[in-house]
């Protein structure tokens, strides 16, 4: 019986339909070598498990009970990939095509049709609470790709692509904030990334819940047309007894994602080309200090997160 598998690697998806249940994991890796150029010994396939452990190369695919069109994330680097890693990202990358909220000057926040979309998400979107919200804590909402993790570069493990100081940042933030992950991908990829980065299993902090692209809404802007955004109103509507505009901050490398809540968004510098920038990126280290400073406030609406570095410098100079 033939299998249909979808492999995600380097920001792209590859469909494999040439294998059968009698083929092995190694056969799959050989097929992936032909598609991606990554040698089998350098491939790590997330989600291919046998009795709770990564499946060995000689395990037959039929023994893994894979469903049709199962999606598998691959980690791994081409032999010649350093050149690719240091090269420019694709021209159509979201980071390049992003725009400044203030320049767009669109009044979308209070449009009735957008508020209705948020109401539908509040009613229909199912949130799996991983750890209960804590009384008196503020809320930190975090994007994943280019915020916590360089998702375009190639590496043998996710840890190599992790933004520096990630665990220290989350450990410190957890003292004052409930932490929510919100990525514009599907939940399977979010869970796989959080596991690979060691976020979902870290004993020093806990994630309250995670949201995927299904919690986002589409809004219309005069200059840019239809765009997808992350409305914090979905969270506030579902957890109004804990979170509001006054105690929520969101980090994202794409400013348009908080177009519905510009006052609550902080546009973080994107973490790209991890192999080149890993030793010099200090963004999370500085933002750790910023979060600690503003945690003392009762109302975040008096802040302008666009000038967070100026605010931090002023506070530290006192």
From Swiss-Prot:
Residues the entry annotates as binding Mg(2+): 143, 145, 253
GO BP, one annotated term: regulation of proteasome assembly
Top EC class for this record: hydrolase
A Pfam family matched in the record: ubiquitin
Keyword flag Metal-binding: yes
Superkingdom in the source lineage: Eukaryota
The enzyme's E.C. designation: 3.1.3.16
InterPro entries tied to this protein: FCP1_dom (IPR004274), HAD-like_sf (IPR036412), HAD-SF_hydro_IIID (IPR011943), HAD_sf (IPR023214), Ubiquitin-like_dom (IPR000626), Ubiquitin-like_domsf (IPR029071), UBLCP1 (IPR051658)
Entry GO terms, CC: nucleolus; nucleoplasm; nucleus
Keywords annotated in UniProt: Hydrolase, Magnesium, Metal-binding, Nucleus, Protein phosphatase
Gene3D superfamilies found in the cross-reference section: HAD superfamily/HAD-like, Phosphatidylinositol 3-kinase Catalytic Subunit, Chain A, domain 1
Residue ranges of domain Ubiquitin-like in the record: 3-81
Catalytic reaction annotation: O-phospho-L-seryl-[protein] + H2O = L-seryl-[protein] + phosphate; O-phospho-L-threonyl-[protein] + H2O = L-threonyl-[protein] + phosphate
Annotated NCBIfam families: HAD_IIID1 (TIGR02245)
Record remark on domains: The Ubiquitin-like domain mediates interaction with proteasomes.
Name the record gives this protein: Ubiquitin-like domain-containing CTD phosphatase 1
Organism of derivation: Gallus gallus
UniProt lineage: Eukaryota, Metazoa, Chordata, Craniata, Vertebrata
GN (gene name): UBLCP1
